[in-house]
């Protein structure tokens, strides 16, 4: 009984791959395997120990995940590369003994001491933490938060923090990122979230805008209508009518020098009155952060162009 090899090649045989480029010495054909690139005629070794830059094929199994981790983020001073040492439980959720908990506490203390290589990094970490807190309180998107963090980094590199509060510059960076992205937030909305007074936040933003030349577009009144309508619980019909009133007011030229949030609230109040929606002047003023007299003044202006 004759036997034959069931496979076309042995398992330890190198896979030969041809290339289109000829040998630089004799012009003969070139063969490439997993270790080297050799000319088939003259035996010249053209390349060896090449790196396989192709994709890595493996099982897509959550239990065997490798080289995974959180993505890099500008919202942390080290881009998110620092190690976080847990406490209380291990990776399986099992409670740790008292001796291991004390050991982890000592490791966390030493790791915290080694996080900051300089005072500059410590100030950067404090400022970015403040930015994350303010962005979370305002419900900003991660992209706006990351842009605010990058703006704070630029301000620190340009030495704009010298003689100024870190908290004020952090709040100013958040407001600057909102302005650059066309978000309907005023400095009156951002400053109360900061740990310093509004005057210091305004001064810090003025420095940022003048020194860095922020590309801040003009504030548009129609940007405030959707957010105020959501806060006041207005219907889509009322919101659309308020947006129409804003367009009419801009065309009539009565919006010059007005408080944008207050005028948008007045448009919502007028639209609610037209559609018999339950919205009072006090509620509209509270949502916009203005007085009732401001709502009435803008209402009278709107009545002059509507009639």
From Swiss-Prot:
The keyword RNA-binding does not apply. PANTHER family: TRANSCRIPTION INITIATION FACTOR IIB, TRANSCRIPTION INITIATION FACTOR IIB-RELATED. This is Transcription initiation factor IIB 5. The keyword Nucleus does not apply. Keywords: Metal-binding, Plasmid, Repeat, Transcription, Transcription regulation, Zinc, Zinc-finger. Stabilizes TBP binding to an archaeal box-A promoter. Also responsible for recruiting RNA polymerase II to the pre-initiation complex (DNA-TBP-TFIIB). GO terms for cellular component: transcription preinitiation complex. Signal peptide: none annotated. A zinc finger (TFIIB-type) spans 19-47. Residues 54-121 are annotated as: Disordered. Zn(2+) binds at residues 23, 26, 39, 42. Sequence repeats lie at residues 129-212, 223-304. Belongs to the TFIIB family.
């Amino acid at each position: 009984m004759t036997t034959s090899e069931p496979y076309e090649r042995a398992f330890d045989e190198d896979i030969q791959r041809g290339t289109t480029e000829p040998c630089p010495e004799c012009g003969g054909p070139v063969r490439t395997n997993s270790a080297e690139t050799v000319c088939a005629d003259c035996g010249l070794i053209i390349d060896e120990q090449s790196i396989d830059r192709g994709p890595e094929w493996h099982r897509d199994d959550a239990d065997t995940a490798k080289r995974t981790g959180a993505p890099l983020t500008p919202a942390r001073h080290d881009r998110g590369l620092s190690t976080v040492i847990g406490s209380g439980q291990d990776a399986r959720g099992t409670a740790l003994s008292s001796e291991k908990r004390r050991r982890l506490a000592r490791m966390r203390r030493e790791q915290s001491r080694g996080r900051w290589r300089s005072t500059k990094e410590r100030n950067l970490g404090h400022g970015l933490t403040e930015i994350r807190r303010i962005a979370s309180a305002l419900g900003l998107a991660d992209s706006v938060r990351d842009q605010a963090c990058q703006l704070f980094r630029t301000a620190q590199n340009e030495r704009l923090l010298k003689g100024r509060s870190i908290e004020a510059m952090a709040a100013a960076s958040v407001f600057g990122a909102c302005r650059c992205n066309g978000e309907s937030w005023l400095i009156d909305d951002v400053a109360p979230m900061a740990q310093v007074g509004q005057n210091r936040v305004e001064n810090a933003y003025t420095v940022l805008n003048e020194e860095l030349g922020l590309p801040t577009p003009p504030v548009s009144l129609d940007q405030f209508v959707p957010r105020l309508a959501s806060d006041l619980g207005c219907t889509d019909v009322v919101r659309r009518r308020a947006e129409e009133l804003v367009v009419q007011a801009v065309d009539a030229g009565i919006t010059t020098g007005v408080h944008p949030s207050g005028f948008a609230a007045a448009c919502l109040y007028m639209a609610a009155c037209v559609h018999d929606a339950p919205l009072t002047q006090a509620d509209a003023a509270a949502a916009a952060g203005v007085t009732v007299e401001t709502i009435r003044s803008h209402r009278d202006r709107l009545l002059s162009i509507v009639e």
